[in-house]
């Protein structure tokens, strides 16, 4: 925490002197600072940091959309998580919806670069929808994320395995809360992508009681 706080102070000073050069560094350091606060269980401080980061990235993305729209989308996703952590679920949903919409546009342009990010943001939206008592919509969001991620998981199992497991668990939680039937084909594909042995793969993502 001390290191990220020092980084924010450092980049804030430089951004005041040369905003064009260092505002992106300040925004990035604020996102990191927010993540640290979140990990330490200090959600109000995490929210303040991520909110400032989003405000900075909005300006940057308006000036140079190709360079900074991905940063804005990621920061909005973090902001949504921070809002949810303090009970501001409707605002959290709005932030994650904006992140999802931006990532959809980015993934349409550069699918290999941004489809995993889109899948991650869909998982975040699912968690927030569950918190709002809308589990059927949550299940649909998580399932979409899984379907988008699966082709990339097959190629990059080490890099994307943790994300895939998290999405799988989120999907199952939403399905259970909604009283829906599990899409066993989707879960089977996920298990095989994580582990070629179907049974081992199912256990790896918590999909089997055996």
Which residue ranges define each predicted feature?
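Alpha-helical repeat scaffolds
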Residues: 140-142, 181-195
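A detector of tandem-repeat and repeat-rich interaction/domain scaffolds
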Residues: 1-176
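Acidic/polar low-complexity scaffolding segments in large eukaryotic proteins
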Residues: 191-210
């Amino acid at each position: 925490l001390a290191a990220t706080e020092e980084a924010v102070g450092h980049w804030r000073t430089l951004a005041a002197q040369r905003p064009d050069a260092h505002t992106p560094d300040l925004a990035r350091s604020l996102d990191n600072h927010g993540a640290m606060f979140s990990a330490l269980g200090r959600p109000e401080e995490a929210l303040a940091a991520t909110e400032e980061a989003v405000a900075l990235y909005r300006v940057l993305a308006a000036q140079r959309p190709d360079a900074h729209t991905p940063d804005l989308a990621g920061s909005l996703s973090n902001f949504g998580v921070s809002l949810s952590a303090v009970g501001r679920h409707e605002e959290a949903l709005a932030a994650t919806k904006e992140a999802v919409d931006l990532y959809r546009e980015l993934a349409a342009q550069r699918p290999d670069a941004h489809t995993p990010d889109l899948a991650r943001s869909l998982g975040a939206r699912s968690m927030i929808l569950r918190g709002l008592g809308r589990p059927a919509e949550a299940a649909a969001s998580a399932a979409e994320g899984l379907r988008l991620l699966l082709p990339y998981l097959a190629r990059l199992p080490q890099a994307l395995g943790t994300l895939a497991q998290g999405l799988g668990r989120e999907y199952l939680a939403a399905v259970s809360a909604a009283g829906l039937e599990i899409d066993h084909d989707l879960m089977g594909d996920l298990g095989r992508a994580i582990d070629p042995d179907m049974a081992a793969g199912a256990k790896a993502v918590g999909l089997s009681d055996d």
